[in-house]
From Swiss-Prot:
InterPro entries: Ni_insertion
Record function comment: Involved in the biosynthesis of a nickel-pincer cofactor ((SCS)Ni(II) pincer complex). Binds Ni(2+), and functions in nickel delivery to pyridinium-3,5-bisthiocarboxylic acid mononucleotide (P2TMN), to form the mature cofactor. Is thus probably required for the activation of nickel-pincer cofactor-dependent enzymes.
Organism: Thermotoga petrophila (strain ATCC BAA-488 / DSM 13995 / JCM 10881 / RKU-1)
Pfam families: Ni_insertion
Family: Belongs to the LarC family.
Catalyzed reaction equations: Ni(II)-pyridinium-3,5-bisthiocarboxylate mononucleotide = pyridinium-3,5-bisthiocarboxylate mononucleotide + Ni(2+)
Protein name: Pyridinium-3,5-bisthiocarboxylic acid mononucleotide nickel insertion protein
Length: 397
């Protein structure tokens, strides 16, 4: 089964909170320090248990000689560095951590570049350029490796609200660079919490380390809490669940419209355009409408983010002038593709699991079709050969 980490950022996310969460979930601090020592930077990880509104959490501070760490959700005033300096430091890490950490700072540079109108090479990092952020981002990547996490899921992110003071003045929450990084990520702005809950470092962790946003079906092994610095109206902690994927639950939408006055030749093109735009599924259902008029119900499954784009295509490429939108929860069983050796050669087979049991085995159609044509045997014989072989090794799939 696939080992996953599910993040519940009900109080946002910052670099130190993520590090605290990883340690709380079982990362060995000494091994983490050992891996990060390759950066060639002198630092100390101060780790302690704290209480946030009745919740015990792990607090991690990155401390440098002569300088106290003070990252929190509020303060943005850190010393600055340019991207080239940071890249030279990160190059000392071992792969795959090196590759991912450098990608994360590239992403940060692009966000800052867009906000300030500068080439990314000339961006002067503030909160994200401080050496503690370098340690936090490198530590985030290394920590996930140490936990053996294969995929990271995340729920909707609370950004907080109000204004934050920066070197450039008072900015609305989320700050501009953070907002840029949060594009495509499901967020909500809690008006009851007048504080910055997501820092740029936290935002880039979400952007680059989270594989999917949505609620997975998982078997929980551990629950951990990483603490932030300031005290808020709510517990200032990042909660995470470490466990194994049993299935996946996604929040999708179903768009439907009934069409009774369109040239049938246009339906094929409409389907192509909907898939090109990002539809997850498109299907047509013959129906009878009022006055016994034959029609076609067009159904489109897509993500919430694609809704407006799908509706635009639907209205432009069909005669529809209205549509129904339904919010759905879709559950997927985890699956993997294995290769099965038969008398006709190797054939890819999709195996689905639920509750740790194999619930479905499906040979890949296109591969079976190709072999059937090449060997000049019935397609059903290829399928039968696969099923015979699978029955012999059923306990090993």
């Amino acid at each position: 089964m696939e080992k996953i980490l599910y993040l519940d950022p009900f109080s946002g996310i910052a670099g130190d909170m993520f590090l605290g969460l990883l340690v709380d979930l079982g990362v060995d601090p000494e091994e983490l320090k050992k891996r990060l020592s390759k950066l060639g930077v002198e630092f100390e990880l101060r780790i302690r248990k704290v209480n946030k509104k009745g919740i015990t959490a792990t607090k991690v501070d990155v401390v440098f000689p002569g300088k106290e760490h003070h990252e929190d959700h509020i303060d943005h005033e850190h010393h600055g560095r340019h991207l080239s300096e940071i890249m030279k430091i990160l190059e000392r890490l071992e792969d795959p951590a090196r590759e991912k950490a450098t990608e994360m700072f590239e992403t940060l540079a692009e966000a800052e570049s867009k906000v300030h109108g500068l080439p990314k090479e000339k961006v002067h990092f503030h909160e994200v350029g401080a050496m503690d952020a370098v340690i936090e981002i490198a530590g985030a990547v290394v920590g996930l490796e140490l936990l053996g996490v294969e995929r990271v899921f995340c729920g909707a992110v609370n950004t907080g609200s109000g204004f934050v003071m920066t070197e450039h003045g008072r900015y609305p929450v989320p700050a501009p660079a953070t907002a840029e990084l949060l594009k495509g990520i499901p967020i909500y702005m809690d008006q009851k919490v007048r504080a910055e809950l997501v820092t740029p470092t936290g935002a880039v962790i979400l952007k680059e380390l989270v594989d999917e946003f949505g609620t997975p079906i998982l078997r929980i092994e551990k629950v951990g809490y990483g603490a932030g610095t300031v005290d808020l109206e709510i517990p200032n902690v990042l909660r995470g669940y470490l466990g194994f994927l049993e299935g996946k639950s996604e929040r999708d939408i179903l768009i439907e419209t009934n069409v009774d006055d369109m040239n049938p030749q246009l339906f094929g093109y409409l389907m192509e355009k909907l898939f090109e735009t990002g539809a997850k599924d498109v299907f047509y259902t013959p129906i009878y409408m009022k006055k016994n008029r034959p029609a076609v119900k067009v159904s489109v499954l897509c993500s919430e983010e694609k809704r407006d784009q799908i509706l635009k295509v639907l209205f432009k490429e069909s005669t529809s002038i209205g549509a129904r939108v339904f919010h759905l929860e879709k559950v997927e069983a985890p699956r993997k593709v294995i290769s099965v050796e038969t008398e006709y050669g190797k054939i890819p087979v999709k195996v689905a699991y639920f509750d740790s049991e194999v619930v479905n085995v499906s040979p890949e159609y296109e591969a079976c079709k190709k072999i059937a044509q090449e060997k000049e045997v019935p397609l059903k014989e290829i399928y039968n050969a696969v099923y015979r072989k699978i029955s012999e090794v059923q306990g090993n799939v």
